[in-house]
Structures are given as structure tokens and as C-alpha cells.
């Protein structure tokens, strides 16, 4: 058989993809539908699945096939797939099975307890579980770093964002720090000159859900291959054929759930448009977490908070919640572009959002590199929040260092993806505007087809065929350039 070793690999990775499919849906269920009493058994079942996948991927035959397939006559896509297979294999073989299982169990325990500990502001209880997750994550980072010859944190960063390093992040975030605080202060000062009319609730959850579904429909979500549910923290999971997104509702606050849905719809459209011809293979997966976040932030911020989109969305708001003063066109746009530093990352405006990310990046990097301990987190969080946003989180763990789900299961290295994603989104939107004259008028008229076609051609259809750098350069003519993000914030808010 032609390319026999490569064919063996595709069959193996197809199996892995199917197990991953089941794990993903079981995890979604754990976060949305599972009764509390099911937590321990579900955690054990998911850990067993992690071990099974690890065993398949680390079989020595896989290593032999990879070496032999490198000599076979493969086309461009097959070569890209082999590169991604090799990366997955190398990442898996660095970890002993016992660590994979222990980390999965500790993560499930920590996340499940966090759901009740966060509302109770119980840092003491949470930190005990987090210490175990950090211990195991440090062990994983140490093993990966020894093999890669890098810092422990960079070894975890590479899982989410291949080829990114903390040295490069420090340059990008250093640039951000040189102008963002001043820009933020100017915007806050400018907006203090005008009055805003806040939307008056209550906004019934069922009606909010209807509005969210309407927004998903506008944005091209395929309901035949996906659904919307409720969870403690908004997320997107599942598989390209069956994408699950969630949001959370507050009957006194309309826009948090709505823009949570719009954000997750960006993730979902990317997943739903990944290359089906390569389904089940690593090359068909999303390129990286930053590219994934670029799509959600493209939808939520570049498109969703634009004047043109907000004008188009407003009739759907009027149809469900009437035409109170807050929902005049001028006020609705102003309210959705309001910049107000706050405690919660997922509710942050796009000017102050990077501050939340840089703060978390600096803390998690120091934590994984062994420069600080879990007990140091609350004081550092408070110090950095005061420096960036002038807000104190002292003793307010719920709205400070306990607010995110990411660290509960050892997702250290993920947070930078949000701000990298915002930078990529600004650069992509700038290129789309150049390529599509009359784009703003089309958006105001509710016609997003040309924009989505552009994303499909330039990002979605390529999966992991190209490196992040190649993908962005092909789409925009240059590698990541922070200038577009700065120009976007300046033109929208000043």
C-alpha cells in the first residue's frame, strides 16, 4: 500500500479524534447538565479516557510510523498533517501516564469545588485544591521544559500557542504597557463628559435566551450542528459537527449574556467551518488558541461592538424588551462602547481587557516558574489591579483571583491568547475592510456574507495546515503587528 506508515497514522489519529469527541461532550455535560452527585464518577471516567488516549498516542509503533512516514511521498496537506501528528506525539511522550491521570482527576476536583467556593468567596478551600493542580502542572512543565530546552512556563505556553515565547510576549505586552494606560485614562475622561442611560431590567432569562439565539442566527451559527446552553462560565466546546456554546444570565443585566453568546458564536463559526475533508486528523484542528480567540473577539469586538452591527441588532432588542430610553440608537451604541474599568475579565470593555490578561500572564508565569506560590496570588492580584485599573480586590477573591475557570484544571499558558487574539482580530478586520469595499454598509444592512466568506477563505478552511505566522501573513500581508490594535482602539474610542 502506498504511504503505508502514513495511513497507519491517519487511522490511529482518527481513533484518537473519536475518543476526544466523547471526552468533549462528557466535559460539556459536566459543566451544564450533570447533577452535583455525579462529579466524582465523571472525573474518574474522564481521567480514564485521558489515560486511554495517552496510551494510544504514546505507543512506540506511533513513533516508528512517524519516522518512516517522513520518508514517504506525501502531498502538502499530508506533510502538514504529519508535522502536527509529530507535535502531538512529542508532547504526549514527555508525560508519564500516572501524571496524565493525576492531573485530570485534580482538575475535575478543583473545578467542581470552585463552582460553589467562588460564590462563597472561599479562598481557603479553593487554594487547597489549586495547590495540588499547580504542583502537577509544575511537574508537567518541568518535563516539557527539559525536553524543549526552555523555561517551564514557555513549555506550557507552547501547548496553546505553538512557537510563542514569553520573551516575545514581553515585547508585545511591553509595547501595550507603554501606551494603553494613557489611552485608557483619556477614554475614561472623554466619556465622563457624556451621560449614559443604563438599561432598566428586569430582563427575563427566557427572553434573553431568545435574543441570544437571534444573534446567533444573524451571525450564521449552524443550529443543525450545535446548541446554546447555560453554565457558570461561558465556553464553547464539542466538535465541528456538534458545537456546544454556553452563556450565563443575570436578569438585571442584559448585555453580558448577549455578548457572551456573540463571543462564543465566533469560536463556534470557526469550529463549524474547519476543513471537513481532513476531519479526524490533527491538520483539521484549529490553528491555536490565539487564532481561536481572534475569531471570538472578531465577532464580539470588531464586529459586535461596531456602530454598524449595533444598529442592525437594535430592532431585535426593541422587539423583545421594548424601546426604553436606554435603547435609543445613540445611547445603545454609546452604552455598548462604554469604557469602565471593572473587576471581571469576561465583562471587560476592549480597552481595559488587556490589563486583565497581562495581570494573569505575569502571575501564572511566576507561579509555574516557581518564583511565587499559590498563597501569594491574592496580594499580587490586588497590587496589579490597583496599578492597572485603580481597583482593589483585597479579600474580594470571588471577583479577583477566583473568577476564572482556567487555572482550576491546569490551563496555565492560555490567558495570553486573549490579547494576542484581540491583536490578530484587529489586524484581520483591517485587511477585510481593505478587501471588501462597502463592508460597513453591508454590516448595517445585516449582510455579513462577504465578511464570513473572507474569514472562511483566509482562516477557517486552513485548520492547522499553516503555522500561525504563515496564516496571518497570508491573510494580511504581514506577521502580527500590534499597530492595528492600537489604531482600532484609538479610532473607536478617541
Language model: regions and residue ranges:
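A well-structured
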Residues: 1-162, 490-494
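Secondary-structure capping and boundary motifs in well-ordered enzyme cores
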Residues: 41, 102, 129-132, 172, ...
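Contiguous, non-catalytic segments that form substrate-binding/exosite surfaces or channel walls
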Residues: 103-254
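Post-HExxH zinc-binding segment in Zn-dependent metallohydrolases
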Residues: 285-326
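Active-site recognition of the HExxH zinc-binding catalytic motif
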Residues: 9, 256-276, 293-297
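C-terminal, non-catalytic "cap/extension" segments appended to globular domains
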Residues: 2, 21-27, 37, 41, ...
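All-alpha helical catalytic cores of prenyl diphosphate-utilizing isoprenoid enzymes
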Residues: 173, 177-180, 205-209, 215-229, ...
Amino acid at each position: 500500500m502506498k504511504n503505508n506508515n502514513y495511513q497507519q497514522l491517519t487511522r490511529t489519529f482518527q481513533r484518537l479524534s473519536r475518543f476526544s469527541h466523547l471526552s468533549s461532550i462528557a466535559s460539556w455535560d459536566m459543566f451544564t447538565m450533570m447533577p452535583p452527585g455525579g462529579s466524582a464518577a465523571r472525573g474518574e471516567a474522564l481521567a480514564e479516557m485521558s489515560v486511554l488516549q495517552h496510551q494510544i498516542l504514546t505507543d512506540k509503533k506511533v513513533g516508528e510510523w512517524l519516522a518512516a512516514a517522513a520518508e514517504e511521498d506525501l502531498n502538502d496537506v499530508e506533510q502538514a498533517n504529519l508535522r502536527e501528528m509529530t507535535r502531538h506525539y512529542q508532547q504526549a511522550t514527555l508525560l508519564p501516564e500516572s501524571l496524565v491521570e493525576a492531573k485530570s482527576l485534580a482538575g475535575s476536583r478543583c473545578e467542581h469545588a470552585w463552582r460553589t467556593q467562588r460564590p462563597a468567596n472561599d479562598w481557603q478551600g479553593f487554594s487547597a485544591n489549586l495547590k495540588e493542580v499547580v504542583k502537577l502542572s509544575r511537574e508537567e512543565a518541568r518535563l516539557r521544559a527539559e525536553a524543549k530546552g526552555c523555561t517551564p512556563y514557555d513549555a506550557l505556553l507552547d501547548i496553546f500557542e505553538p512557537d510563542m515565547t514569553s520573551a516575545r510576549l514581553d515585547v508585545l505586552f511591553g509595547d501595550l504597557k507603554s501606551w494603553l494606560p494613557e489611552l485608557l485614562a483619556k477614554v475614561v475622561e472623554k466619556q465622563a463628559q457624556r451621560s449614559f442611560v443604563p438599561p432598566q431590567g428586569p430582563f427575563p432569562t427566557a427572553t434573553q435566551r431568545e435574543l441570544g439565539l437571534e444573534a446567533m442566527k444573524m451571525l450564521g451559527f449552524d443550529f443543525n450542528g450545535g446548541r446554546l446552553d447555560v453554565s457558570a462560565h461561558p465556553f464553547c466546546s464539542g466538535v465541528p459537527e456538534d458545537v456546544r456554546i454556553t452563556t450565563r444570565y443575570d436578569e438585571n443585566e442584559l448585555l453580558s449574556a448577549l455578548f457572551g453568546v456573540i463571543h462564543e458564536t465566533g469560536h463556534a463559526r470557526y469550529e463549524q467551518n474547519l476543513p471537513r475533508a481532513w476531519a479526524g486528523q490533527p491538520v483539521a484542528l484549529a490553528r491555536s488558541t490565539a487564532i481561536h480567540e481572534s475569531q471570538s473577539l472578531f465577532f464580539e469586538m470588531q464586529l459586535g461592538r461596531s456602530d454598524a452591527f449595533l444598529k442592525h441588532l437594535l430592532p431585535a432588542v426593541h422587539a423583545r424588551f421594548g424601546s426604553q430610553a436606554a435603547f435609543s440608537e445613540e445611547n445603545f451604541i454609546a452604552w455598548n462602547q462604554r469604557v469602565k474599568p471593572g473587576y471581571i475579565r469576561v465583562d471587560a470593555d476592549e480597552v481595559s481587557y488587556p490589563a486583565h490578561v497581562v495581570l494573569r500572564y505575569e502571575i501564572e508565569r511566576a507561579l509555574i516558574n516557581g518564583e511565587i506560590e499559590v498563597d501569594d496570588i491574592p496580594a499580587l492580584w490586588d497590587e496589579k489591579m490597583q496599578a492597572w485599573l485603580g481597583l482593589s480586590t483585597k479579600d474580594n477573591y470571588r471577583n479577583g483571583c477566583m473568577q476564572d475557570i482556567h487555572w482550576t484544571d491546569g490551563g496555565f499558558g492560555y490567558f495570553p491568547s486573549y490579547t494576542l487574539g484581540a491583536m490578530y482580530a484587529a489586524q484581520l478586520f483591517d485587511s477585510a475592510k481593505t478587501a471588501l469595499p462597502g463592508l460597513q454598509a453591508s454590516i448595517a444592512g445585516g449582510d455579513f456574507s462577504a465578511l464570513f466568506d473572507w474569514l472562511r477563505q483566509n482562516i477557517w478552511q486552513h485548520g492547522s495546515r499553516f503555522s500561525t505566522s504563515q496564516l496571518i501573513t497570508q491573510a494580511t500581508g504581514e506577521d502580527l503587528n500590534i499597530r492595528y490594535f492600537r489604531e482600532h482602539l484609538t479610532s473607536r474610542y478617541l
